[in-house]
């Protein structure tokens, strides 16, 4: 039964190994009828175990040939045999180099007709070689008949060539095959001796070719012999050691990347095992081969084009007279299907699906074996075919996990394959030059970690010096568990028996120590080591990564056992990964002072001495600081970011409890940054409370705050606020910006008191714009009040000069002047407020009109889609947002600008008329004062000067008429120019009106100030009054002013708009003739040097207008 199964498994042309037991059970018609000499020759060529221990995998199924009595039978059999043989060669080992091409005699003689195509000299050489071998065999048989008889009795291994069939019935018997050969010989007229010799040569060449293939496979996989015999299943495995770059798919040959089984490189024996297997008993070898033959059945895939042998019917003969030299797609598909069928047969043996592995996995396995973190997979198909495979059958866990990182506890030594060690070239003593293995290094430092080296130079053996001695030591110490063997990547081992262990080479962690790991048989130790390391596939190779916890354990172990000189801290200390934390400790004395004074301030005087004593006891016992976010000393905050009093008391109570807990033995004191920062938080929170409290409670709060926070720490002076006005946070800054100038504003929303409900930037800007007018108005009123108070204080503190000759008229005039000055200042302040308001409104309007929503509203309003009434209704909606309210207000304001300008113009006209009336009244009063003063001073200067000439009434009337004519002319000119400029800038006209009102108000103030100073400081002195007493010109001036005032007052009732024309006449005359100024007013301007320049300018305008009158030189001079 075993022979039948083996017969179905192997394809046509495969070698078959038989024993005596198998030969007795087999029928006689299954063997080829060979001569006795051929059987003896086959017996004399025994098969070695190393050559035939692993038969090749089954080739793809070939078509079944029916036995015919024609020459097609022999042709098909030989052709099928040759093709399957070539297929089996392709299946042998994809990773191995291709075998040398066979001799042409074996390729062509297999067909039966190939000798016709051979040249004459090749056929002659083959025949001579076969004849010489036959004669040599006959001589050896005759010389030693006893040995041949003993070999026949033993019958160790019989080799036979069987054309494979699916059933024994289809195999032709000996007579049919003999008739086939004789038919061939009859056709070709070839003697039977030559046919037998060709058959014998074919068998010999096939055996030689099979031996060449096996030798090439085993020779290429392991370049050097191992130093000792292997007692375990894992030690004989050979690994193809590749560089890190070779593991990438682009640098490997295509055969390495094919879907091969994992055992493509791991199933072959090392040369030492092959040498050991030659000495084995042939009976054990044959029985082992019988056991390793798996039961196989034909499996037909539905996608295959040709069915396997076991499924195909026997009545489908395919007759081909030519040998196959080129493969079609269907034949290649058959080859692939056969390979997969063989994999399925192999996998069913161990009931595990085959895992397809590439050479990357094999390289990873080799490196992990060198690192001693490889767990052998316990499946039977990775086990070597040796007698030692039965010793560890109880360890089968059927666990196919490849990178398992715990040690095999049944292995006495730690190095898995010593042939790899010797196959590595000798390298200098540097640590891990393989780029695939990344060492543990510090960030920012180029130093390697010194924990990777041995303690003594004796422990590190060189490959060049003591290789044999060192290997003997390793072999002698294999049975000791206390031996710690370290494998470095340059092919060297350091042995340390009964010594303190090194730290692991690859950054592997140590739970307790290496000796404890070796001694312990506990699974928890292995599981913890398995959890500490993992393998990561990177582009340049494989990276064994260790966790930070294991690195901490390793560093602690190395600090304990190292005997090296300490390096400076700045040179070697530093984080080893980005996950490490840098701990900063300090502020020793400052923290103590802060805690003492904090306890004093909070009334904890009893615990002060205990805390100071506690600090001195535990001053140098530091532990690592807790995370800041998880600290239990963080005081609680309410929604307004204020520290409650209860929270502060709770914090101090917890601090007191912590200080009591620190008295326990062995407990270290940790540096708490929250304690250090607590006083600063108190300061800022109290200052923030001050901003939220009503103003009447703020002085008490400030006093308490200054008492509380004066002695907290020397750092608090840098963190403290300078005053209540400066904001200690961004929230306070916004709050102060909103509440500035209107702290008691009822329109302020209550939500602004909460920090968590901060308004948006748009809302803040809208509120600032909306409240800007109110702020300006309030500040302007305050400025007005302050200015009036200043005027009052100056007038009260003004030195009273001697009242020399003042009568009732002069006193009344002085009071009236003061009252008019106050009124004019009020009008000036109002005008400044209006100007500032108009300027802010224009800026605000321009900013709002530039927005897209405002422009859309304006466009719809001009098109008639919406009305002003609808906008007003929307404006009255309380739920309207500030941005929309601003937009609607700006649109309405822009559409009403024309009406507002007209109203503003009327108001300015009324204001200007009142100002001019008050100015004329002041001039009239001044004329009266001048007349009285002149009357008093005239008798004193009679002997020196003549009496001044009095102007007649006709002169005054003529002067008034000239002024009226000039005014009418100027009015006509203004009307013409206004028509031209009216379509221009309306905004500029509005500003011109404001400036005119300013100048109108400033002019009487300047006149009254100048004359008032002259009256007060003069006191009857001619030179102090500032008027040169030239007699006639001064009298002319005073009389002219007086007459002018009379005529102008009479004209003003008839001309309501004469004031504006008069003002414009002044301006234009000043622009046209700025150089014409009368000499008689120079002293007056010099005395009025303390007045404002604008006032001087107004006075000059008035005088230049008078000097422009026609015939003025003839009339007055």
Swiss-Prot record:
Residues 679-712, 988-1001 have a biased composition (Low complexity). Changing residue 368 to A: Mild reduction in interaction with eIF4E1. Complete loss of interaction with eIF4E1. Residues 283-294 have a biased composition (Polar residues). Disruption phenotype: Mislocalization and precocious expression of orb in the ovary, accumulation of high levels of orb in nurse cells, elongation of orb poly-A tails, hyperphosphorylation of orb and reduced osk mRNA levels. Reduced number of germ cells. Predominantly expressed in ovaries and in 0-2 hours old embryos. Weakly expressed in testis. Expressed in young embryos through stage 9, then it decreases throughout the rest of embryogenesis. In ovaries, it is expressed in germ cells throughout pre-vitellogenic development, but is not expressed in the somatic follicle cells. In germarial cysts, the protein (and not the transcripts) is transported selectively into the oocyte. GO terms for molecular function: eukaryotic initiation factor 4E binding; mRNA binding; RNA binding; translation regulator activity. Adapter protein that plays a central role in localization of transcripts in the oocyte and in young embryos. Maintains RNA targets in a repressed state by promoting their deadenylation and protects deadenylated mRNAs from further degradation. Binds to and recruits eIF-4E to the 3'-UTR of some mRNA targets which prevents interaction between eIF4E1 and eIF4G. This may contribute to translational repression but does not appear to be necessary for it to occur. Can promote translational repression independently of deadenylation and eIF4E1 binding. This is Protein cup. It comes from Drosophila melanogaster (Fruit fly).
């Amino acid at each position: 039964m075993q022979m039948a199964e083996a017969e179905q498994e192997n394809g046509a042309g495969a070698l078959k190994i038989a024993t005596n037991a198998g030969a007795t059970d087999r029928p006689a018609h299954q063997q080829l009828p060979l001569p006795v000499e051929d059987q003896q020759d086959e017996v004399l060529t025994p098969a070695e175990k190393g050559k035939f221990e692993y038969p090749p995998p089954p080739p793809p199924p070939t078509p079944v040939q029916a036995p015919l009595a024609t020459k097609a039978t022999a042709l098909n059999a030989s052709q099928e045999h040759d093709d399957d043989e070539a297929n089996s060669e392709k299946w042998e080992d994809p990773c191995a180099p291709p075998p040398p091409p066979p001799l042409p005699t074996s390729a062509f003689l297999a067909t039966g007709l190939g000798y016709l195509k051979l040249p004459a000299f090749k056929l002659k050489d083959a025949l001579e070689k076969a004849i010489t071998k036959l004669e040599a065999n006959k001589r050896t048989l005759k010389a030693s008949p006893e040995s041949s008889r003993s070999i026949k009795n033993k019958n160790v291994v019989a080799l036979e060539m069987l054309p494979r069939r699916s059933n024994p019935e289809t195999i032709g018997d000996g007579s049919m095959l003999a008739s086939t050969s004789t038919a061939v010989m009859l056709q070709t007229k070839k003697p039977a001796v030559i046919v037998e010799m060709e058959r014998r040569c074919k068998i010999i060449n096939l055996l030689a070719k099979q031996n060449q293939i096996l030798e090439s496979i085993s020779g290429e996989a392991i370049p050097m012999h191992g130093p000792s015999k292997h007692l375990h299943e894992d030690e004989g495995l050979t690994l193809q050691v590749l560089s890190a770059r070779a593991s990438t798919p682009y640098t490997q040959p295509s055969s390495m990347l094919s879907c091969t089984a994992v055992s493509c490189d791991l199933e072959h024996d090392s040369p030492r095992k092959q040498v050991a297997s030659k000495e084995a008993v042939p009976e054990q070898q044959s029985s082992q081969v019988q056991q390793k033959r798996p039961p196989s059945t034909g499996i037909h895939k539905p996608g295959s084009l040709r069915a396997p042998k076991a499924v195909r019917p026997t009545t489908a003969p395919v007759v081909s007279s030519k040998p196959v030299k080129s493969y079609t797609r269907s034949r290649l598909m058959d080859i692939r299907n056969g390979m997969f069928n063989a994999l399925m047969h192999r996998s069913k043996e161990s009931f595990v699906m085959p895992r397809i592995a590439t050479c990357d996995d094999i390289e990873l396995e080799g490196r992990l074996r060198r690192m001693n973190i490889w767990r052998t997979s316990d499946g039977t198909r990775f086990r070597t075919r040796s007698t030692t495979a039965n010793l560890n059958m109880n360890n089968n866990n059927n666990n196919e996990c490849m990178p398992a990182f715990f040690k095999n506890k049944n292995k006495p030594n730690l190095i898995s394959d010593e042939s790899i060690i010797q196959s590595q070239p000798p390298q200098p003593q540097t640590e891990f030059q393989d780029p695939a293995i990344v060492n543990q290094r510090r960030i920012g430092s180029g130093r390697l970690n010194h924990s990777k080296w041995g303690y003594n130079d004796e422990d590190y053996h060189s490959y060049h010096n003591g290789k044999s001695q060192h290997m003997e030591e390793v072999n002698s110490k294999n049975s000791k568990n206390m031996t710690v063997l370290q494998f470095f990547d340059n092919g060297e081992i350091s042995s340390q028996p009964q010594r303190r262990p090194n730290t692991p080479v690859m950054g592997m962690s140590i739970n307790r120590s290496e000796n404890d790991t070796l001694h312990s048989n506990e699974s928890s130790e292995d599981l913890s080591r398995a959890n500490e390391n993992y393998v990561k596939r990177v582009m340049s190779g494989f990276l064994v990564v260790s966790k930070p916890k294991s690195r901490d354990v390793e560093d602690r172990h190395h600090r304990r056992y190292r005997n090296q000189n300490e390096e400076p801290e700045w040179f070697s200390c530093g984080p080893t990964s980005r996950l490490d934390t840098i701990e900063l400790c300090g502020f020793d004395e400052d923290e103590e002072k802060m805690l003492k004074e904090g306890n004093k301030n909070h009334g904890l005087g009893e615990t002060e001495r205990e805390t100071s004593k506690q600090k001195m006891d535990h001053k140098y016992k530091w532990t690592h600081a807790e995370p800041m976010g998880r600290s239990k000393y963080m005081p609680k905050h309410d929604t307004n970011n204020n520290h409650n009093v209860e929270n502060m008391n709770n914090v101090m109570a917890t601090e007191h409890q912590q200080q009591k807990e620190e008295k326990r033995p062995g407990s270290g004191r940790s540096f708490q940054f929250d304690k250090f920062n607590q006083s600063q938080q108190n300061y800022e929170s109290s200052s923030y409370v001050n901003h939220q409290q009503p103003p009447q409670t703020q002085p008490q709060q400030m006093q308490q705050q200054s008492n509380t926070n004066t002695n907290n720490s020397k750092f608090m002076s840098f963190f403290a606020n300078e005053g209540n006005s400066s904001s200690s946070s961004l929230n306070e800054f916004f709050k102060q910006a909103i509440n500035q100038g209107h702290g008691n504003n009822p329109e302020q929303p209550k939500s602004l008191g909460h920090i968590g409900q901060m308004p948006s930037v748009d809302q803040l800007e809208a509120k600032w714009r909306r409240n800007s007018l109110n702020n300006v108005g309030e500040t302007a009123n305050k400025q007005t009040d302050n200015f009036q108070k200043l005027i009052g204080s100056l007038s009260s503190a003004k030195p009273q000069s001697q009242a020399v000759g003042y009568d009732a008229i002069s006193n009344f005039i002085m009071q009236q002047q003061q009252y008019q000055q106050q009124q004019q200042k009020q009008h000036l302040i109002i005008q400044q407020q209006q100007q500032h308001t108009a300027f802010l409104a224009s800026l605000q309007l321009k900013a709002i009109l530039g927005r897209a929503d405002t422009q859309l509203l304006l466009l719809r309003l001009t098109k008639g889609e919406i009305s002003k009434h609808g906008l007003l209704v929307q404006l009255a909606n309380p739920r309207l947002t500030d941005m929309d309210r601003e937009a609607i207000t700006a649109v309405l304001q822009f559409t009403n600008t024309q009406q507002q300008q007209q109203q503003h113009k009327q108001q300015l006209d009324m204001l200007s008329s009142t100002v001019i009336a008050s100015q004329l009244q002041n001039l009239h009063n001044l004329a009266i004062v001048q007349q009285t003063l002149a009357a008093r001073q005239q008798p004193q200067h009679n002997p020196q000067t003549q009496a001044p000439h009095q102007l007649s009434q006709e002169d005054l009337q003529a002067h008034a008429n000239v002024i009226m004519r000039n005014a009418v002319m100027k009015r006509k000119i203004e009307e013409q120019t206004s028509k031209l400029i009216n379509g221009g800038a309306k905004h500029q006209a509005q500003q011109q009106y404001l400036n005119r009102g300013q100048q109108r108000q400033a002019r009487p103030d300047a006149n009254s100030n100048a004359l008032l100073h002259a009256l007060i400081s003069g006191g009857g002195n001619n030179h102090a009054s500032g008027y040169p007493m030239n007699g006639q010109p001064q009298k002319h001036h005073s009389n002219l002013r007086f007459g002018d005032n009379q005529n102008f007052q009479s004209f003003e009732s008839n001309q309501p708009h004469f004031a504006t024309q008069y003002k414009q006449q002044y301006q234009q005359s000043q622009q046209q003739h700025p150089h014409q100024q009368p000499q008689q007013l120079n002293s007056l301007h010099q005395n009025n040097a303390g007045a404002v320049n604008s006032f001087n300018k107004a006075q000059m305008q008035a005088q230049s207008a008078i000097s422009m009158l026609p015939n003025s030189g003839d009339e007055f001079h």
